[in-house]
Amino acid sequence: MATTSLDLAKVRNIGIMAHIDAGKTTTTERILFYTGVSYKIGEVHDGAATMDWMEQEQERGITITSAATTCHWPLEDNDYTINIIDTPGHVDFTVEVERSLRVLDGAVTVFDGVAGVEPQSETVWRQADRYGVPRICFVNKLDRTGAEFHRCVDMISDRLGAQPLVMQLPIGAEADFQGVVDLVRMKALVWSADAAKGEMYDVVDIPATHTEAAEEWRGKLVEAVAENDEEVMELFLEGQEPTEEQLYAAIRRVTIASGKSSDTTVTPVFCGTAFKNKGVQPLLDAVVRYLPTPLDVEAIEGHDVKDPEVVVKRKPSEDEPLAALAFKIMSDPHLGKLTFVRVYSGRLVSGTAVLNSVKGRKERIGKIYRMHANKREEIESVGAGDIVAVMGLKQTTTGETLSDDKSPVILESMDFPAPVIQVAIEPKSKGDQEKLGVAIQRLAEEDPSFQVHTNEETGQTIIGGMGELHLEVLVDRMRREFKVEANVGKPQVAYRETIRKTVERVDYTHKKQTGGTGQFAKVQIAIEPIEGGDASYEFVNKVTGGRIPKEYIPSVDAGAQEAMQFGILAGYEMTGVRVTLIDGGYHEVDSSELAFKIAGSQAFKEAARKASPVLLEPMMAVEVTTPEDYMGDVIGDINSRRGQIQAMEERMGARVVKGLVPLSEMFGYVGDLRSKTSGRASYSMQFDSYAEVPRNVAEEIIAKAKGE
């Protein structure tokens, strides 16, 4: 069993992110093959990819859970440790991407050389911008018909607002793609036809056909680096050419600095074809050369356990007290519950006790594993900057902090979006009912965007998620992993309710005096809509002079929040409401927390009825790519679904239609689109915002909810 204290300068914690079909899993597979971890190249096409270890992922050819894998790469006589978090590219799994980005130091973004920057690429890029993650780009699939490297580079600039640094030029195109020109070394890297798996490539002089373009792009590269780096700027102004080493160092500085600033993201761009085994080794060199080590990342910020206002910083050092973030929970068929942890400071040692500072509970660290996609290596301890899987944590959930109990800290947690779609699930037998309970508990632990509640009136179990595919996968896992046989209802939209009018004053007295201890609570509240922003609820206390004792105020707040769970129009959760407690009264003997909670709840319901309540529905940003011939049909169809067309553009000879469409109108869209366009159009959609439902539609929804 190994105990590892890694040299942090030689560690890279990276994610590989992309749109669903850009070839991300294939790229990761090649990385694992060339770094010696995987002896047979796993192919997504035949369902053998190493990272995609859930059965469904192998069937669907997409990555659902981010598996963490450790591999090693030698560069210039040094051995580097690369921890790779594989992230899904399908929009329904954006939560997985969010939580991966939270614990990474750098990322490789993979683009499809044919399609360029696609909708999910933009989403993932924005997520990475939000977390300040430095990136390098890999333009993949250059062996495919219609692949164009430079168009993809332009799209990175135009669509993502980034400044691409072109590091390589392709040699040959489509089926004749042979290798790349390295613009730093000014050499050509050519993969020989003999090496079937692309292990060997030759470093040769740049072919005469490419020297002019190479000179031109080398000049552009140096100029772009000079704009962002003072050292190279000085050389540039003196008319001196930077050396290879100076250029490597400057590109590294620029890439890492752009992650920390809110200005334009500067990103080195590489190219190749992972499927045909060309261009992956230089990409690994680039991961080591340009992406940050845990030491390059600023000290992580958290807050004091007792006072959230007090900022606590922890440097990436083993000399600091322990601070680690649990970012993913997985059920391993052999080991049970595994918690993936990023250690930011201090040391995590097998068999010792740590504090879950969010819950204030002690946890014992069981075994610690360094994970390959579905194999593992046990280690005794792990230090700052590393990512591992831990056994034995019973109470820790995603986003919680493990710290030293003598100097506890709470690291910033992760925000998970509310579900936009839900289905009712009914177990077929009593035995299935019990299994369903276990399955739901496990899946909810693993996936915070999966939510469950019971419909009070029908007694049905309702599960919610981020899209049809997300729920399909969850139900599928219940069947496979937990052997639950259940009937699944049709997907339902997660509507919300809100108010449009301010109600200045509602008085409510809760009184129950029937001998013995009674109940008494009097409240006066106002409610108003919260304009703009994402706040779903605010509570303001304006009670003065002890009219309601301090200890009862939170009960009024709790009562109002409880009432918001079931709105007054159709029982959907309410959002966007500010409640102000103005005044009230109490009784020395009969008042209690419960009495004030009931009063708060009833006063809220009464006020909400008077505040012009309306129904909200999730609107999806839909992007359809279609041949010109079907453009009219596609637009007509979107309009018929209460959609609003927002933009139309041309992309690679096809037309792209962008619009906002209510989710309720998008069920079954994939089949309709296929039949309208003879299967030649494709679409993607992701949640955009909530919008008010038109009155005639709202009336139908309300009547249905009330069973009329």
Swiss-Prot record:
Location in or out of the cell: Cytoplasm
Keyword set, alphabetical order: Cytoplasm, Elongation factor, GTP-binding, Nucleotide-binding, Protein biosynthesis
Domain tr-type G: 9-295
GO terms classed as biological process: ribosome disassembly
Keyword Flavoprotein: no
GO cellular component: cytoplasm
A molecular-function term among this protein's GO annotations: GTP binding
Binding-site positions, GTP: 18-25, 86-90, 140-143
Chief place where the protein resides: cytoplasm
InterPro entries from the UniProt entry: EF-G-like_DII, EFG_II, EFG_III, EFG_III/V, EFG_IV, EFG_V, EFG_V-like, G_TR_CS
Intrachain S-S bonds: none
UniProt function note: Catalyzes the GTP-dependent ribosomal translocation step during translation elongation. During this step, the ribosome changes from the pre-translocational (PRE) to the post-translocational (POST) state as the newly formed A-site-bound peptidyl-tRNA and P-site-bound deacylated tRNA move to the P and E sites, respectively. Catalyzes the coordinated movement of the two tRNA molecules, the mRNA and conformational changes in the ribosome.
Family membership noted in the UniProt record: Belongs to the TRAFAC class translation factor GTPase superfamily. Classic translation factor GTPase family. EF-G/EF-2 subfamily.
NCBIfam families: EF-G, PRK12740.1-3, PRK12740.1-5, small_GTP
HAMAP family: EF_G_EF_2_B
Full protein name: Elongation factor G 1
Organism of derivation: Streptomyces coelicolor (strain ATCC BAA-471 / A3(2) / M145)
Gene: fusA
